[in-house]
Amino acid sequence: MTIHVKNNIHWVGQRDWEVRDFHGTEYKTLQGSSYNSYLIREEKTVLIDTVDHKFSREFVQNLMAEVDLNTIDYIVINHAEEDHAGALSELMARIPNTPIYCTYNAIDSITGHHHHPEWNFHTVKTGDTLDIGNGKQLIFIETPMLHWPDSMMTYMTEDAVLFSNDAFGQHYCDEHLFNDEVDQTELFEQCQRYFANILTPFSRLVTAKIHEVLGFNLPLSMVATSHGVVWRDDPAQIIHLYLKWADSYQEDRITLFYDTMSNNTRMMADAIAQGINDVDPGVAVKIYNVARHDKNEILTQVFRSKGVLVGSSTMNNVMMPKVAAMLEEITGLRFQNKKASAFGSYGWNGGAVDRVQTRLMDAGFETTLALKTKWRPDGSALEVCREHGREIARQWALHPLDNTPARRVISPVKPAATAPQVTTAAQPMSASAESACGCNEVAAPQSATQPTVQSESGCMQCSVCQWIYDPALGEPMQDVTPGTMWSDVPDSFLCPECGLGKDVFNPIR
């Protein structure tokens, strides 16, 4: 089956209505997905990407019904992951000498998956072109770490089509191919879910790469993604949304998620949410039990939120395992511009709340006072929870509220060994109670748009792969001698792990 895209471009991909798990079981594809491959027939015939490996035979058979495989002049692989290049082995078995155009890093990935180093690879870099006849060219644009080191985009001149790889896509399956033909609510929900769960850690790179592409001043008629729809109706809309989402995005909403053994922590969550609504009925509040709800939906809601409250019962003096797993996911996604607080019930030891609070601080959230309740909360304890929610609403308000006291915060700059908390025996989050814990007000973490400053130790951390530059060690492989401060490191310096430049490094605080 083929679908006409534009002029001499046809979609030759594969729909996958049944898939419900992606990247192992890390991403729930509730709307299915598609693996988009494109066939270009100008004076030269070009295939851009293939499909997931489980559809290899069907893909090649469908392609053979459309074109003589021996007439394919070039294969372009924008991304070597198996859902993009999975059918290469099946295809190359029939046309083994066909040139494959890809990035240098893609060769390592492709040979690692398919074990054919003898294939006819041609490496490309940003700005390289490939003439395909009829006055048209393909222009290649490297996009490392969006979201693999090998990633790139391909732009077709004259037709003004950007084959964007994973960027601007979504795991969304529909009989229709174009964005103006599908349910708009479903589409944009899946776009945001995709960005929040996959691309958020690379937000700085998203912004930089989009501005780089826009700087080429190329006309744009379509964005042809690797998953989901082709953007033909106002294709720039998804680009502008990406710029918005990548810029420390938040809405006026608060997300609570928890796990509980005896419903006590659930009761706390409900009461806290009631308190938030008492003070600020305009704020959107969502509550999720991590053991019962879709993990990716929760992460998407956290991405959208200005703040998150994380609750856990104490089990063996630690947090519930599903809460711990969710916090690990959140740490990896590196959300920006968000506040957080921990809460939970306990019996003889409340270690879970302390650990949750510390993990939130480690993840870069601006944390406020935590809340513990012993055993099942009674009427007075639930009122403490409601008051806690009221104070959260005041402190996290994005607009003026009546009777809003000034609040102090705990910064993620220097996480404490034991997180401060209030209990049902204490005054809930009063100014005097918080002062008594010895916390001082400090500035919030720098946003990505602020100038980089050097940490007191001089150590800098790559925001993409987490590699750390230590001035005491330098980087001898790049002739950076021990004792070289970051400000004196040459601008040509590249992260040894991911190969990106100095602009993705942040000070370790």
Curated annotation (Swiss-Prot):
Name the InterPro entries on file. Answer: Anaer_NO_rdtase_flvorubredoxin, Flavodoxin/NO_synth, Flavoprotein-like_sf, Metallo-B-lactamas, ODP_dom, RibonucZ/Hydroxyglut_hydro, Rubredoxin-like_dom, Rubredoxin_dom
Annotated positions binding FMN: 260-264, 342-369
Q: Which domain of life is it from?
A: Bacteria
PANTHER family reported in the protein's UniProt record: ANAEROBIC NITRIC OXIDE REDUCTASE FLAVORUBREDOXIN
Cofactor list:
Fe cation; FMN
All copies of the Flavodoxin-like domain together span: 254-393
Please tell me whether the keyword Electron transport is annotated for this protein: yes
Q: Where is this region: Zinc metallo-hydrolase?
A: 30-210
Query: Domain Rubredoxin-like, which positions?
Result: 457-508
Per the entry, what this protein does is:
Anaerobic nitric oxide reductase; uses NADH to detoxify nitric oxide (NO), protecting several 4Fe-4S NO-sensitive enzymes. Has at least 2 reductase partners, only one of which (NorW, flavorubredoxin reductase) has been identified. NO probably binds to the di-iron center; electrons enter from the NorW at rubredoxin and are transferred sequentially to the FMN center and the di-iron center. Also able to function as an aerobic oxygen reductase.
Its recorded name reads: Anaerobic nitric oxide reductase flavorubredoxin
User: What is the scientific name of the source organism?
Assistant: Pectobacterium atrosepticum (strain SCRI 1043 / ATCC BAA-672)
Q: Which residues bind Fe cation 2?
A: 83, 166, 227
List positions binding Fe cation 1.
Answer: 79, 81, 147, 166
Q: Which gene encodes it?
A: norV
Q: Which residues bind Fe cation 3?
A: 462, 465, 495, 498
Mind telling me which GO cellular component terms the entry cites?
Answer: cytoplasm
Q: What family is this?
A: In the N-terminal section; belongs to the zinc metallo-hydrolase group 3 family.
What are the subcellular locations of this protein? Answer: Cytoplasm
**What does the UniProt keyword field contain?**
Cytoplasm, Electron transport, Flavoprotein, FMN, Iron, Metal-binding, Oxidoreductase, Transport
- Cofactor remark from the record: Binds 3 Fe cations per monomer. Binds 1 FMN per monomer.
